[in-house]
């Protein structure tokens, strides 16, 4: 392999993203599609770019991502987490900046399971006194 690449795994909700950073022009590819083609919402695109913009590495790396599971929000968060981990592998001095922004910490919030005898995780069926 001629060019050096950096790898990071990111997780959020039920999404798992595998991220490779290679020195390049700044193209972001998600599941063999461009970022604009893969994500429709502007907020999802912004979340994906956040760690690169914070560390001023926007045009320095080409980002290749394979992401599975979850929805748009979870996948975007997983990609951001993976990019952050890959950036740390590339340059450990970025740790302080990324930690302060809260990008290194894995967001452990997941959907609460539905309980039996209830309509949802916490919602009850409608109660009638009479």
Curated annotation (Swiss-Prot):
Record key words, sorted: Ribonucleoprotein, Ribosomal protein
A Gene Ontology term for the protein's cellular component: cytosolic small ribosomal subunit
Pfam families: Ribosomal_S9
Residues making up the signal peptide according to the UniProt record: none
Keyword Ribosomal protein: yes
Xref: InterPro entries: Ribosomal_Su5_D2-typ_SF, Ribosomal_uS9, Ribosomal_uS9_bac/plastid, Ribosomal_uS9_CS, Ribsml_uS5_D2-typ_fold_subgr
The keyword Ribosomal protein appears for this protein: yes
GO biological-process terms attached to the record: translation
Gene Ontology MF terms in the entry: RNA binding; structural constituent of ribosome
Family annotation (NCBIfam families): PRK00132.1
Family: Belongs to the universal ribosomal protein uS9 family.
PANTHER family: RIBOSOMAL PROTEIN S9 (PTHR21569), SMALL RIBOSOMAL SUBUNIT PROTEIN US9M (PTHR21569:SF1)
Stated name of the protein: Small ribosomal subunit protein uS9
Species the sequence originates in: Pelobacter propionicus (strain DSM 2379 / NBRC 103807 / OttBd1)
């Amino acid at each position: 392999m001629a060019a050096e690449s950096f790898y990071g795994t990111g997780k959020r909700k039920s999404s798992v993203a595998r991220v490779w950073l290679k020195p390049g022009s700044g193209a972001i590819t998600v599941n063999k599609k461009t970022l604009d083609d893969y994500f429709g919402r502007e907020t999802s695109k912004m979340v994906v770019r956040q760690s690169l913009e914070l560390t001023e590495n926007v045009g320095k790396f080409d980002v290749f991502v394979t992401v599975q599971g979850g929805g748009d929000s979870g996948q975007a968060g997983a990609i951001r987490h993976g990019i952050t981990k890959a950036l740390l592998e590339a340059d450990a001095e970025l740790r302080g900046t990324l930690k302060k922004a809260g990008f290194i910490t894995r967001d452990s919030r997941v959907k609460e399971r539905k309980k039996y005898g209830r309509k949802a995780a916490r919602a009850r069926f409608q109660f009638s006194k009479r």
